[in-house]
């Protein structure tokens, strides 16, 4: 933790100066030690200020710092049509229901190998992985005290996926729910991020942190607007949910809407 070394040395110096004989060496050691204590406090306060947006995560440095944490770094699309939000059916048996278009960010394995080894980052195998999910940023950090350094790497945008276009294509265009020719390019805006502190997982045998960037699709022309509206006619693969249904966690017909869906709603 920032400032800990200086502060500790300063405290030890102050204690030592108390037992020293002779005014001059005692005064010198006292002044040096007091300076180290002040420097340690200042360094710690600067650290708190620089990480002010993550104060709720700083507790990982002192509360169970050596315990593992599961981390999911994802992005979600907000696609709104006349006050309703486009959701897609999730077919995996472990957690079925409707959810926003989106998914986990990908990372570059070889480019991040040295960093991830130093941070104790390893794949999360609580959910079976395959060649499509092998490089998903759903990982285990063996010691949660390394969590802030991991998030600093993520914020640097280095050696990881940054564009949400891939999941849009995989979930809507490749299954031919949207015409490929109309969506060769898309426009979107970054709305913000939703990050939860480390919480007890309702599913996995380890605490977890869930992060999601929210992007809003901006249709670029009439053809895109018509195609998005036509998703309403794609059967039960797509559902246009009201904010009330999303908050309630189910459609009007009682079909489950997954809990993380609320993140796409305006705050």
Where are these regions (language model features)?
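N-terminal leader/linker segments that precede catalytic domains of diphosphate-processing enzymes
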Residues: 1-267
């Amino acid at each position: 933790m920032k400032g800990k070394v200086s502060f500790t040395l300063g405290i030890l110096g102050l204690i030592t100066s108390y037992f020293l004989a002779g005014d001059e060496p005692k005064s010198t050691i006292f002044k040096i030690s007091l300076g180290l204590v002040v420097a340690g406090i200042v360094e710690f306060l600067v650290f708190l200020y620089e990480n002010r947006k993550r104060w709720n995560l700083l507790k990982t440095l002192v509360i169970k710092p050596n315990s593992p944490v599961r981390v999911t770094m994802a992005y979600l699309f907000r696609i709104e049509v006349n006050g309703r939000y486009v959701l897609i059916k999730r077919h995996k048996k472990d957690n079925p229901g409707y959810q926003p278009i989106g998914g986990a960010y990908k990372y570059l394995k070889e480019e991040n190998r040295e960093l991830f080894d130093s941070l104790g980052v390893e794949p999360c195998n609580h959910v079976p992985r395959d060649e499509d999910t092998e490089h998903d940023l759903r990982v285990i950090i063996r010691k949660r005290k390394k969590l802030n350094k991991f998030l600093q790497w993520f914020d640097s945008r280095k050696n990881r996926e940054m564009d949400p276009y891939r999941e849009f294509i995989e979930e809507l265009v490749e299954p031919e729910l949207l015409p490929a020719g109309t969506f060769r390019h898309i426009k979107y805006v970054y709305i913000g991020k939703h990050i939860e502190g480390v919480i007890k997982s309702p599913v996995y045998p380890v605490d977890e942190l869930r992060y999601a960037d929210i992007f809003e699709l901006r249709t670029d022309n009439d053809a895109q607007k018509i195609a998005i509206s036509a998703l309403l006619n794609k059967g039960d693969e797509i559902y246009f949910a009201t904010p009330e249904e999303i908050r309630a966690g189910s459609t009007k017909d009682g079909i489950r809407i997954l809990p993380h869906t609320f993140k796409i709603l305006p705050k």
